[in-house]
Amino acid sequence: MAGLELSGLAGKVAVVTGRGRMRSIGRSIAVEMARAGCDVVVTGTGRAPENYPDDEKTAGWRDIESVAEEVEATGQRALAVVSDVSDPASVEALTAQVLGEFGRVDFIVNNAGAARGPDRVPVVDLAIDDWMKVIRVNLTGTFLMSHFFG
């Protein structure tokens, strides 16, 4: 992030959700937090490689594993965890795994978002199931992460 310098993160632990895409803002957040001295847990839904866009396939991208490697390249610890932020059991399991590995969490970055295409239509054309997915990930997911890690 050009022009932005983070401070006060040395020795802290962060969980960044929804950062499996190569062009995700979550990727930049995770890497910059690591550069500032933060250990980072990165989460995503674990997309299958056949669902990667062409630029990710060409680059040899591996979803959250690639970002975890970028975090580790800064000298910080990283943990990549496949997790569905909209599912209470998944978030509870994530919480247990992260606390077991790091002992605490100092920051949650609720970056996961479901807006990927089917919901980008006039509201009268929007399928109810597509709307409900957006609500589950964007709203309920943020609540669950804050609730379990809070």
What is each model feature region?
Residues 61-62, 82-94, 128:
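The beta1-alpha1 cofactor-binding region of Rossmann-like NAD(H)/NADP(H)-dependent oxidoreductases
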Residues 69-88:
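Rossmann-fold cofactor-recognition segment
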Residues 8-47:
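Canonical Rossmann dinucleotide-binding motif of NAD(H)/NADP(H)-dependent dehydrogenases/reductases
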